[in-house]
Amino acid sequence: MDCYRTSPSNSWIYTTVILCIFGFFSMMRPSEPFLIPYLSGPDKNLTSEEMTNEIFPVWTYSYLVLLLPVLVLTDYVRYKPVIILQGISFIITWLLLLFGQGVKTMQVVEFFYGMVTATEVAYYAYIYSVVSPEHYQRVSGYCRSVTLVAYTAGSVLAQLLVSLANLSYFYLNVISLASVSVAFLFSLFLPMPKKSMFFHAKPSREIKKSSSVNPVLEETHEGEAPDCEKQKPTSEIPSTSGKLHKGQLNSLKPRNVTVEVFVQWFQDLKECYSSKRLFYWSLWWAFATAGFNQILNYVQILWDYKSPSQDSSIYNGAVEATATFGGAVAAFAVGYVKVNWDLLGELALAVFSVVNAGSLFLMHYTANIWACYAGYLIFKSSYMLLITIAVFQIAVNLSVERYALVFGINTFIALVIQTIITVIVVDQRGLNLPISIQFLVYGSYFAVIAGIFLMRSMYIIYSTKSQKDVQSPAPSENPDMSHPEEESNAIMSTKL
């Protein structure tokens, strides 16, 4: 049982390898692209209405209810127990998928899958407690890349087994169960961290900027920095008063430390969201992520509606693999694009939100399954491109701790929005719309997002132009004279 508490090695390489193996097998789930054909087929005999209006909404509700408690618990218990909990939830989910029957059982499946997605935060946060700051960027890149590779590999494997070997969907779920079981076993061998970002932080440690957190964050943003970056890092919460020394900190009751943590969280979030740039990028993140998750949750039902799996060959695995790969390429390519994001960022959000809306309208109006697949490819790739930019714009001037806070709150707000959409559009207690009409609503939703950010971008461009006109030197002045104030107001382009 020592594997729960100790590690055979303190090397960051050992930790990274174990974590990446866990990430690979937890995401290598070939059954996912064919979940709807499996549930609607002879194994489960569920109707489209039951899946859409009764079963799938449970995932959204459970994810929302579990997210905030899990975020707090993850830091308090120092990550590893939550990663193990995720592995257990994976196993329960697929055992119920394989051997459970009926709507109620599938609702329980969705609850445990909500637990899986809520505990996913531990996988990404774990590395910052066991890996030294100079390795943050590299390890973060490994952990994120391996999940994309695993999901793509699982989708390709599923398509090959279904199309060439005519394998039953049931056995795809058996393979997924075996994969997540391997992930659970490897989670037991992760080293137990001695510290965490907040509740078990070391007051004296140096805080690295989040430019070393994400592999796309390579340079410091040269525009206006939000005020929150100038404040004391959240990891120093127990000593924020300036009067608590180490000995006094150890004598504090846990309840008092917890109160200090929550108070500091509130102050940090208030300061961070006071930055207009961070606020608007976070606003797009929340609304777009809510819509994106909703599409992922219901797109297979739309495909089955356009081309029933019992009557025709389906290529869900190939489409998911292509979409994931295309999104990864788009996210990688944006790191080499020089754009003045301060000036044109909101315009980019508006333009690509129009693209998202158009792709969803295409998926609604077309009767051709291949056009529907194409719309999904465009939608997923453009979202992954934009979310990469949004992560950079939000995180570039924040400490690791404050980025984690903003990320958690943005995700929670996205879930609140998604829950509202689900209750109104999907749930049988709401409008209970058929799946095709739902995608018309989702397309309109992204069109509204595009309109909001188009107006915002035009305001920024007009304000910047007016400011430059006011600051322009008079014609009679010496053109060789330098103007420090003009240089300080120039907005530099940023290379991601």
UniProtKB/Swiss-Prot annotation:
List all Basic and acidic residues biased stretches. 218-233
Compositional bias segments (type: Polar residues):
234-248
* Record topological domains on the Cytoplasmic side: 1-7, 75-81, 132-144, 191-282, 338-342, 397-405, 456-496
Taken from the UniProt entry, a GO cellular component term is: plasma membrane
Extracellular face: residue ranges? Answer: 29-53, 103-110, 166-169, 304-316, 364-375, 427-434
Q: How does it sit in the membrane?
A: Multi-pass membrane protein
The UniProt entry lists the main location of this chain as: membrane
Does this UniProt record's set of keywords contain ATP-binding?
A: no
Query: Where is the site Essential for pyridoxine transport?
Result: 86-87, 91, 93-94, 168, 173
For this chain, one GO molecular function annotation is: thiamine transmembrane transporter activity
- Quote the subcellular location field of this record: Membrane
Which Gene Ontology biological process is one annotated for this entry? pyridoxine transport
On whether Zinc is a keyword of this UniProt record, the answer is no
What does it catalyze? thiamine(out) + H(+)(in) = thiamine(in) + H(+)(out); pyridoxine(out) + n H(+)(out) = pyridoxine(in) + n H(+)(in)
Source organism superkingdom: Eukaryota
Q: What is the protein's known function? A: Mediates high affinity thiamine uptake, probably via a proton anti-port mechanism. Has no folate transport activity. Mediates H(+)-dependent pyridoxine transport.
Similarity comment: family membership: Belongs to the reduced folate carrier (RFC) transporter (TC 2.A.48) family.
Q: Which PANTHER family does the UniProt record give? A: FOLATE TRANSPORTER (PTHR10686), THIAMINE TRANSPORTER 2 (PTHR10686:SF37)
Q: Which NCBIfam families match?
A: rfc
- Under what name is this protein listed? Thiamine transporter 2
Taxonomic lineage from the root: Eukaryota, Metazoa, Chordata, Craniata, Vertebrata
Gene designation per UniProt: SLC19A3
